Design a protein with these regions (language model features):
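Pre-Walker A (Motif I) flank of P-loop NTPase domains
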Residues: 1-2
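The conserved Walker
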Residues: 9
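Conserved substrate/cofactor phosphate-moiety recognition/catalytic segment
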Residues: 18-60
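Conserved nucleotide-sensing/catalytic segment adjacent to the nucleotide-binding pocket
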Residues: 43-89
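A glycine- and Lys/Arg-enriched "phosphate-lid" helix/loop adjacent to the NTP-binding pocket
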Residues: 88-156, 160, 169
Length: 170
């Protein structure tokens, strides 16, 4: 099973993906490469060249497969697509290849948690995070992929994730 978390910044993607990777047996956790890349280089805002490198590496991680293992992705192609659309507006073929990444489900995290500041985040306003959340919903619907919106408390989100996986509701 390949599960990806998506949504605006500071919406719980990392918290939930790390948690889920400990809940399921035989799991490979794949972190968000952009954060690793930018923090390692002490970059606050990615340039076009940085973004291209991030896309290339993250997409190679999307193609990572190991038989019988669950793959839990802290981010997905939609995070890269929205970021590109909002900031760079580049034509990158990697951002158009949806079926080949083969995610079984995308969990769209609502921005209903308190925004946590860090050096890489740029949208503290709830209205901006809400606008981006709507953009993610449109992207997911237009791409006709399986997705479930996660909203509510952390426990409610965890419960919905587990019941969705157990019921195979995707």
């Amino acid at each position: 099973m390949r599960i990806a978390f998506t949504g605006p910044e500071s919406s719980g993607k990392t918290t939930l993906s790390k948690w889920l990777s400990t809940e399921l047996s035989d799991t490979i956790y794949i972190p968000e490469f952009a954060r690793e890349y930018l923090e390692e280089r002490k970059i606050v805002r990615a340039s076009e060249n940085d973004f291209r490198a991030i896309v290339k590496r993250q997409c190679s991680l999307f193609n990572q497969t190991e038989s019988n293992a669950h793959h839990i992705f802290d981010t997905d192609i939609f995070v890269l697509r929205v970021w590109n659309d909002e900031v760079f507006k580049l034509k990158l073929p990697e951002l158009e290849i949806l079926p080949s990444y083969g995610m079984n489900i995308h969990f769209l995290c609502a921005p209903d948690v308190e925004w946590e500041e860090d050096s890489l985040r740029s949208a503290p306003a709830q209205s901006e995070r809400g606008r981006l959340f709507e953009k993610y919903k449109i992207e997911l619907r237009n791409s006709q992929v399986n997705f479930i919106i996660l909203s509510g408390s952390l426990d409610e989100k965890k419960s919905l994730i587990l019941s969705s996986i157990q019921d195979n509701s995707f």
